[in-house]
Amino acid sequence: MRVMGVDPGLTRCGLSVIESGQGRKVIALDVDVVRTPADEQLHRRLLIISDTVEHWMDTHRPDVIAIERVFANHNANTAMGTAQAGGVIALAAAKRDIDVHFHTPSEVKAAVTGNGRADKAQVTEMVTRILALQAKPTPADAADALALAICHCWRAPMIARMAAAEAMAAEARRKYQAKLKAARA
């Protein structure tokens, strides 16, 4: 499975692509950070992000996009910009019929470090080890994008099993309701 990990942001947007192997083996294929000027108009900054992300999707052909889920932090403007960047990325994926999954920061940290409260340095260190990189990915947005992709690769089998179980439960519920309806008639 090829996963594109995205750490959305208006000033810096981390992008990565990794390929999953057998078991928990993952291989980094590409990583970068899109930067937009803070003094540029919002719609132009989003366009820069959109154009770059679309190029990455067309070049790398990911099977799925893993995006960090935005949460309200102390700065509402930062959260808003991050959410807008994430929306542009999700839209680009939808146009290409690529599945999108959102993961919380604590989910990602727990997946790669074993600790949902790990700091940036711990995440970067573990990403470097897991992917057997020669150098630590910088800035932190690059490491976070790789961590998101790793998290999704490792969680994908569980996500698929949960979806299958939910589908089975929905089918069983539908059959049961049809049986009840027939019994009442």
UniProtKB/Swiss-Prot annotation:
It comes from Mycobacterium sp. (strain KMS). The keyword DNA-binding applies. Transmembrane segments: none annotated. This is Crossover junction endodeoxyribonuclease RuvC. PROSITE patterns: RUVC. Its main location: cytoplasm. Keywords: Cytoplasm, DNA damage, DNA recombination, DNA repair, DNA-binding, Endonuclease, Hydrolase, Magnesium, Metal-binding, Nuclease. Its cofactor is Mg(2+). Mg(2+) 2 binds at E68. Mg(2+) 1 binds at D7, D141. The keyword Transport does not apply.
